[in-house]
């Protein structure tokens, strides 16, 4: 006799397929266990004998407990069947939902029945020690319905994903979607609604105006995963800003080419800076952050104690007057704009403290969604992490306010490829030691659990 009864699967798995270690879960995630309880309570949970034994042979409360075994016998607390198909047939007319909860053999045999309607998957971002693995592509025939925002607990980054078979209408149990979807959805919006515009570079853009994205910094670090982001470049550029540097060669010597195109002899000559030495970028971000109002000469001059050191003032305000509404960092100085190789794109940021949590809101006038924005998100998130550590604050949000929000015409095909990708959990960020904000090096920053799709090549418009 055949059955039309379907079931859901509920499991946690690393990105390489790890699900268990020594007949136990390899991680302790309290929130994930609470979610498991929320999903399965009131239903029928189907498990293998080893999974049942890993629970000290105690049935889960408020659920019908079913064990698949040829050796065990049914009791008042547990129903036993030799095969999954037998359990499905027995509960064919039951109004209760069925959930397969492990282990490996149960998941594999369950998929072989072709009765799995959906999967509630917890994706573990860190490869912890495991001795039981599923094929990491075991759910490749399912569609992603929803992906949650990244969470963290006990040094482990993870998220929830709801996978469905076509025609499934099961509940996802996901309240807040992955925050990288904001970025991907914005690309789609620009492609659908963007106005074609000429621009300074001659490449041309599709543009919209006045958008916002928000990232929760307390749970994870928002380094995009749908393409690999050059994190070392993000760090080195920010440290270069914080030191007040304007010499692009210092970045080039470290293999960071972000500013290379804007510092060449040819480029500087075309914007009227023939007197400037190659890779002297003028009074750009770092100069404005550390010496706002000082007279710029060249990148070799010592500007100590000249102008306003906005970064130091921010640190003092965060420590001594965190409720101030004047904790602002500005890179836009109209007097200096013509001396800059490139006027600031990320113009101003404001810092806000509530309940001991530090948040940052940054306004960006020109927003290159293909190349620039992934860097900008990570850079200001990193700055907020560093300021929070310096001032003994917890982390809040990064709010990104977007002015001219655009895609360059030569990035369209690459971005079409990117928006088809499903994000991985955001990584965690650890800052080692207790150095001054101005003394950190790249080696002081550690990404934990960064998994990303392959890099996508896009040419920078200069």
From Swiss-Prot:
Pathway entry: Cofactor biosynthesis; tetrahydrofolate biosynthesis; 5,6,7,8-tetrahydrofolate from 7,8-dihydrofolate: step 1/1
Residue ranges annotated for the DHFR domain, each copy included: 6-165
GO MF terms, alphabetically ordered: dihydrofolate reductase activity; thymidylate synthase activity
Catalytic reactions of this protein: (6S)-5,6,7,8-tetrahydrofolate + NADP(+) = 7,8-dihydrofolate + NADPH + H(+); dUMP + (6R)-5,10-methylene-5,6,7,8-tetrahydrofolate = 7,8-dihydrofolate + dTMP
Entry EC number(s): 1.5.1.3, 2.1.1.45
Binding residue positions for NADP(+): 12, 18-24, 49-51, 68-71, 102-109
Binding of substrate, residues: 10, 32, 101, 122
GO CC field: cytosol; mitochondrion
Keywords: Methyltransferase, Multifunctional enzyme, NADP, Nucleotide biosynthesis, One-carbon metabolism, Oxidoreductase, Transferase
Annotated spans, Thymidylate synthase: 180-462
Superkingdom of origin: Eukaryota
Name this polypeptide is given: Bifunctional dihydrofolate reductase-thymidylate synthase
Lineage, top ranks: Eukaryota, Sar, Alveolata, Ciliophora, Intramacronucleata
């Amino acid at each position: 006799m055949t059955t039309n009864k379907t079931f859901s699967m509920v499991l946690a798995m690393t990105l390489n397929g790890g699900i268990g270690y020594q007949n136990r879960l390899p991680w302790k995630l309290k929130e994930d266990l609470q979610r498991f309880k929320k999903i399965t309570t009131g239903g029928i949970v189907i498990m293998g004998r080893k999974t049942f034994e890993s629970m000290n042979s105690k049935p889960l409360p408020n659920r019908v407990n079913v064990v698949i075994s040829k050796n065990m016998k049914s009791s008042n607390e547990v129903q036993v069947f030799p095969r999954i198909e037998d359990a499905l047939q027995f509960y064919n007319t039951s109004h209760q939902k069925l959930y397969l909860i492990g282990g490996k053999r149960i998941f594999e045999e369950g998929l072989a029945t072709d009765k799995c309607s959906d999967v509630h998957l917890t994706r573990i971002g860190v490869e912890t020690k495991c001795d039981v693995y599923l094929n990491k592509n075991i759910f490749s025939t399912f569609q992603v319905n929803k992906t949650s925002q990244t969470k963290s607990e006990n040094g482990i980054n993870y998220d929830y994903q709801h996978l469905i078979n076509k025609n499934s209408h099961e509940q996802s149990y996901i309240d807040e979607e992955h925050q990288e979807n904001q970025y991907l959805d914005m690309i789609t919006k620009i492609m659908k609604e963007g106005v074609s515009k000429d621009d300074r570079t001659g490449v041309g853009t599709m543009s919209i105006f006045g958008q916002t994205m928000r990232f929760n910094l307390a749970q994870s670090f928002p380094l995009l995963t749908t393409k690999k982001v050059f994190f070392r470049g993000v760090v080195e550029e920010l440290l270069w800003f914080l030191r007040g540097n304007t010499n692009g060669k210092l970045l080039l010597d470290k293999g960071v080419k972000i500013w290379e195109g804007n510092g060449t002899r040819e480029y500087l000559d075309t914007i009227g800076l023939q007197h400037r030495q190659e890779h002297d970028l003028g009074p750009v971000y770092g100069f404005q952050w550390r010496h706002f109002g000082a007279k710029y000469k060249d990148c070799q001059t010592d500007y100590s104690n000249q102008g306003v050191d906005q970064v130091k003032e921010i640190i003092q305000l965060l420590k001594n007057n965190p409720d101030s509404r004047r904790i602002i960092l500005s890179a836009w100085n109209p007097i200096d704009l013509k001396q800059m190789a490139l006027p600031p794109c990320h113009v101003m940021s404001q810092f806000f403290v509530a309940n001991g949590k530090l948040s940052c809101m940054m306004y960006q006038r020109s927003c290159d969604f293909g190349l620039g924005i992934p860097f900008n998100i990570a850079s200001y998130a990193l700055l907020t992490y560093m300021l929070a550590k310096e001032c003994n604050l917890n982390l809040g949000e990064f709010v990104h306010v977007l002015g001219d929000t655009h895609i360059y015409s030569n990035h369209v095909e690459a971005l079409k490829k990117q928006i088809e990708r499903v994000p991985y959990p955001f990584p965690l960020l650890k800052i080692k030691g207790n150095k001054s904000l101005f003394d950190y090096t790249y080696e002081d920053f550690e990404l934990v659990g960064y998994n990303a799709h392959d890099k996508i090549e896009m040419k920078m418009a200069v």
